[in-house]
C-alpha cells in the first residue's frame, strides 16, 4: 500500500505544469566617483554636446572658452591638447579626451550608468547605438562634404550616391515612427544627432520644410531645460563666424540610378602556338 501511495505522489508531481521564472535584468553598476571635468569649448562646435550632456545629468563641470573670440578659445585648447586641438577637448582628472561621442559614452558609463541609455536588453538599445554612431560616421561626414562641394559648385541634380537629402530622409523616416532617436525615451543619441541635423537645415544643404518629423523632434529638444541651459552657457551670443548658408541645395526628388560601367567586348581567342622543338 505504501508503495502505491508513493507511486501516486510521484505521478502527480510529474504531471504538474512546469513553472519558469524570468530573471530580472542586471542592475546598472554603481557610478564611480567623478574627478573634476573641464570642457574646452568654442561656440557652435561639437563641444556643445558635452555641456548639454552634463546639464542633462546634473553633473558638475568647468566650461572654458573666451566669449566671442575663436582664436583665444583655440589657444586655450592648444595649451592642453597640442597634438589634436579640437573642440571638444575635455579633461577628466588628468586624462585628456577628444571625440564627442566617445566622451559622452565615457561619462555615462563611468559616472552615470544607466542614464540617457535604453536598457541593454531592449530593442531600443540597438537603435540608440546606431544613431550614436550614425551622427558622425554617416550623417555629419556627408552633409559637411556636400556643403564644401556645393559652396564652390551649386548642384543641379541629385547625386546617384547617398547624398545629404538621403541621409536626412533616413533620420526623418525613423522619427516618423519613434519619438526620439533613443526609441521611446530621450537618450544620448538625441544629443549626438542635433548638431549634424542643424548643420544640414540651417545651412540650406537640404530643404528643411521637407522633414516634418525632424522639425517636431527639434521643437521638443528646444523645450528641454538642459538644452536651454546649454545655449545660455555655451552660446550666449550665438555662433561667431558661422558659415554662410548655401545659395541652393540639390533639387528634391528620387536619386538617379548609378551608371554601370559599360561591358567590355569579348576578346577573340588566340590560336595556340605550336610547341617549340
Model regions and ranges:
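GST-like fold's C-terminal all-alpha helical module
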Residues: 132-223
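Compositionally biased, proline/threonine/alanine/serine-rich low-complexity intrinsically disordered stretches
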Residues: 21-32, 255-277
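Sec-dependent signal peptide recognition
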Residues: 2-7
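Residue-level signal for nonpolar/aromatic packing positions in well-ordered secondary structure
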Residues: 39, 54, 90, 171, ...
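Bacterial signal peptide processing site
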Residues: 16-18
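Acidic/histidine-enriched, glycine/proline-rich intrinsically disordered or flexible terminal extensions
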Residues: 234-261
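GST-like domain detector, emphasizing the conserved glutathione-binding G-site
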Residues: 22-158
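C-terminal motif of bacterial Sec signal peptides marking the signal peptidase cleavage site
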Residues: 12-14
